[in-house]
């Protein structure tokens, strides 16, 4: 999901 990607990005 996009949310998971954002969290992993940070």
Curated annotation (Swiss-Prot):
Q: Which UniProt keywords apply?
A: Amidation, Neuropeptide, Secreted
Q: Name one GO cellular component term.
A: extracellular region
- Carries keyword Chloroplast? no
ATP-binding: present as a keyword of the record? no
What does the entry state regarding organ or tissue expression? In larvae, both myosuppressin and myosuppressin(2-10) are expressed in the CNS but not the midgut, thoracic perisympathetic organs (tPSO) and abdominal perisympathetic organs (aPSO). Myosuppressin is expressed in the ring gland (at protein level). In adults, myosuppressin is expressed in brain, cardiaca, corpora allata and thoracic-abdominal ganglion (at protein level).
Q: What is its main location?
A: secreted
Give the location in the cell. Secreted
The record's Gene Ontology biological-process terms are:
neuropeptide signaling pathway
Residues carrying Phenylalanine amide: 10
Family as reported in the entry's similarity comment: Belongs to the myosuppressin family.
Protein name according to UniProt? Myosuppressin
